[in-house]
C-alpha cells in the first residue's frame, strides 16, 4: 500500500548526494561527492526547456555527440549541481562554481555519465516520512 501522505520529496528541490565512483587508478580513498537536484526539480525543468531550445535551434537530438550537443548537456547538468566535496585541482580544494562544474563535466565524461544516471533515479530523491504512532499501519 502506498500512503501519499508519507512521501517526502523535499530532496527533489533541496538536492541529494551522489558518491562518485572514481576510477581505481585515480582513487586515493577520499570520497568524491556531488550534491544534485532531481529531474523533477524546478531548476531542472527550467534548464531542460532551454536545453531543448538549444537542440532544436541546431537541429540536434538528445544525446547528440556534436560539440554543441555536448556543451548543452554540460550546461543542463551544471544547473542542477549544488555543491561538491573531495574535488581538488593541483592538490588544493577546487571550489564548486558554475565555471568549474562545467569544466569538470566537459573534460571528465565518466563524471557527467554518473550525474546523468543519478538525477533520473527517483529513489535518490524520494523518501518515506518518519512514522508516528498515529500514522503506523495496524499490524
Task: Describe the function of each predicted region.
Residues 1-14:
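Short, intrinsically disordered N-terminal pre-domain segments
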Residues 10, 24-26, 71:
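Generic marker of residues within folded, mature protein domains
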Residues 11-23:
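Short acidic, Pro/Gly- and aromatic-enriched capping/linker segments at domain boundaries
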Residues 28-139:
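Short, surface-exposed, charged amphipathic helix/loop patches that serve as local interaction elements
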Amino acid at each position: 500500500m502506498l500512503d501519499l501522505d508519507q512521501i517526502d520529496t523535499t530532496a527533489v528541490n533541496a538536492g541529494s548526494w551522489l558518491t562518485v565512483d572514481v576510477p581505481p587508478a585515480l582513487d586515493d580513498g577520499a570520497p568524491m561527492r556531488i550534491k544534485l537536484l532531481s529531474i523533477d526539480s524546478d531548476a531542472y525543468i527550467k534548464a531542460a526547456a532551454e536545453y531543448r531550445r538549444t537542440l532544436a535551434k541546431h537541429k540536434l537530438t538528445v544525446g547528440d555527440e556534436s560539440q554543441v550537443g555536448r556543451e548543452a548537456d554540460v550546461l543542463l547538468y551544471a544547473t542542477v549541481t549544488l555543491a561538491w566535496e573531495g574535488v581538488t585541482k593541483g592538490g588544493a580544494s577546487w571550489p564548486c562554481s558554475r565555471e568549474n562544474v562545467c569544466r569538470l563535466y566537459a573534460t571528465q565524461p565518466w563524471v557527467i555519465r554518473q550525474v546523468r544516471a543519478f538525477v533520473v533515479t527517483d529513489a535518490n530523491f524520494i523518501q518515506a516520512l518518519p512514522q508516528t504512532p498515529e500514522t503506523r499501519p495496524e499490524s
